[in-house]
């Protein structure tokens, strides 16, 4: 078996990626989220495929087809809730994965980091289009509001929005194309994840100390396969406790009403995992300014390798930067809360302060902290 593992063209690729891969001996549980994201993607593709067999992408029947899946299809309710909550689980793992990358300086691997940012954009696009498909009230109005943001682009904005809609409003053509893209994008994400791994294995994994670990590597199997398996068991235990008992915990009650273009919900908001970006969008009174801030709230991650001023890579021995990192985490949580609140005082001013803090911490305070820590450590 060993000879086949090292000689067969396909087995050899798997062997180099998951069995004989040299890995640092000290990576912690925070490095588990890559494999957990792979598991989430598999769950989403598998459950989505079964939902696709019963779903119809037509404005007249989309809502009732989802109801049909839940009521008439064998275990259809379970598949639907696995898919809906699987998206939330995907984003939990994704944000923790990004947080670990920021804390331990993994953004120094620029190619891997940039592919990761592209993966984040693709995942967000997929989730947004998936939210539109049940054709409930929040699906329809969310699609209308978010796609309408493109009209802020000078000169071509209005034409671009109508081109995306396939008409003068969100309608059957919009639902059809969103369904098509929602189906194909996860496979593109899977392909990009392979590229992400390819670049990662070129450099090797980072470690909590942020120092080269070439002198102290261990094989990925059995050490980290066992560790990943433990993470998978814990994740699935949590997930399959949540799905049957609290399936609608993270959903919006408005989406249980069929889409009605004549009745606007009192508060239009996206799913919880977009609320921090939505709060940043709303905090700027100007439409174009809000759209630019929304895009920059994600694109700012691409700047991290270029604004790194500290000589040490990891935050493990940098207390000032550690404090700023946890301040940033708290700020994102505040933005998430604000994004779910109505646009009225005091939420408006809190959102504006939190949005300003988000960009200030990343662009100003963290680089200054890095310079000061270099002086303190005499590096």
UniProtKB/Swiss-Prot annotation:
The chain crosses the membrane at residues 33-53, 77-98, 113-133, 178-198, 226-246, 288-308, 320-340, 347-367. Binds 2 heme b groups non-covalently. It is found in: Mitochondrion inner membrane. A ubiquinone binds at residue 201. One of its GO terms (biological process) is mitochondrial electron transport, ubiquinol to cytochrome c. PROSITE patterns: CYTB_CTER, CYTB_NTER. Gene3D superfamilies: Cytochrome Bc1 Complex, Chain C. Pfam families: Cytochrom_B_C, Cytochrome_B. The keyword Transport applies. Keywords: Electron transport, Heme, Iron, Membrane, Metal-binding, Mitochondrion, Mitochondrion inner membrane, Respiratory chain, Transmembrane, Transmembrane helix, Transport, Ubiquinone. Its main location: mitochondrion. CDD domains: cytochrome_b_C, Cytochrome_b_N. InterPro entries: Cyt_b/b6_C (IPR005798), Cyt_b/b6_C_sf (IPR036150), Cyt_b/b6_N (IPR005797), Cytb/b6-like_sf (IPR027387), Cytochrome_b (IPR030689), Cytochrome_b_C_euk/bac (IPR048260), Cytochrome_b_N_euk/bac (IPR048259), Di-haem_cyt_TM (IPR016174). It is a multi-pass membrane protein. Component of the ubiquinol-cytochrome c reductase complex (complex III or cytochrome b-c1 complex) that is part of the mitochondrial respiratory chain. The b-c1 complex mediates electron transfer from ubiquinol to cytochrome c. Contributes to the generation of a proton gradient across the mitochondrial membrane that is then used for ATP synthesis. Belongs to the cytochrome b family. The cytochrome bc1 complex contains 11 subunits: 3 respiratory subunits (MT-CYB, CYC1 and UQCRFS1), 2 core proteins (UQCRC1 and UQCRC2) and 6 low-molecular weight proteins (UQCRH/QCR6, UQCRB/QCR7, UQCRQ/QCR8, UQCR10/QCR9, UQCR11/QCR10 and a cleavage product of UQCRFS1). This cytochrome bc1 complex then forms a dimer. Heme 1 (or BL or b562) is low-potential and absorbs at about 562 nm, and heme 2 (or BH or b566) is high-potential and absorbs at about 566 nm. This is Cytochrome b. It comes from Dipodomys nelsoni. The lineage of its organism: Eukaryota, Metazoa, Chordata, Craniata, Vertebrata. The gene is MT-CYB.
């Amino acid at each position: 078996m060993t000879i086949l593992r090292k000689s067969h063209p396909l087995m050899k690729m798997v062997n180099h990626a998951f069995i004989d891969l040299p890995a640092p001996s000290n990576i912690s549980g925070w490095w588990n989220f890559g494999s957990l994201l792979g598991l989430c993607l598999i769950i989403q593709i598998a459950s989505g495929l079964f939902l696709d067999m019963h779903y119809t992408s037509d404005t007249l029947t989309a809502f009732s087809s989802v109801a049909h899946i839940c009521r008439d299809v064998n275990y259809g309710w379970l598949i639907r809730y696995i898919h809906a909550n699987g998206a939330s689980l995907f984003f939990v793992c994704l944000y923790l994965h990004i947080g670990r990358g920021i804390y331990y300086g993994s953004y120094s691997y620029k190619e891997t980091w940039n592919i990761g940012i592209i993966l984040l954009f693709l995942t967000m696009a997929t989730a947004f289009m998936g939210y539109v498909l049940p054709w409930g009230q929040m699906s329809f109005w969310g699609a209308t509001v978010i796609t309408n943001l493109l009209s802020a682009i000078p000169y071509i904005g209005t034409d671009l929005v109508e081109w995306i809609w396939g008409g003068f409003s969100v309608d059957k053509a919009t639902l059809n194309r969103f369904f098509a893209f929602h189906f194909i994008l996860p496979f593109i994400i899977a392909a990009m994840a392979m590229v992400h791994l390819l670049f990662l294995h070129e450099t090797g994994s980072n470690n909590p100390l942020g120092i080269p670990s070439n002198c102290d590597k261990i094989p990925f199997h059995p050490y980290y396969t066992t560790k990943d398996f433990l993470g998978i068991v814990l994740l699935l235990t949590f997930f399959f406790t949540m799905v049957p008992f609290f399936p609608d915990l993270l959903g919006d009650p408005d989406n249980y009403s069929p889409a009605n273009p004549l009745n606007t919900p009192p508060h239009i908001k996206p799913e919880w995992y977009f609320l921090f970006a939505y709060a940043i969008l709303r905090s700027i009174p100007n439409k174009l300014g809000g759209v630019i801030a929304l895009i920059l709230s994600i694109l700012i991650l691409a700047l991290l390798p270029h604004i790194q001023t500290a000589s040490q890579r990891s935050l493990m021995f940098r207390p000032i930067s550690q404090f700023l990192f946890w301040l940033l985490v708290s700020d994102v949580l505040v933005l998430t809360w604000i994004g779910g609140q109505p646009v009225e005082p005091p939420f408006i001013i809190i959102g504006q302060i939190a949005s300003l803090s988000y960009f200030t911490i990343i662009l100003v305070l963290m680089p200054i902290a890095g310079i000061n820590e270099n002086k303190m450590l005499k590096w």
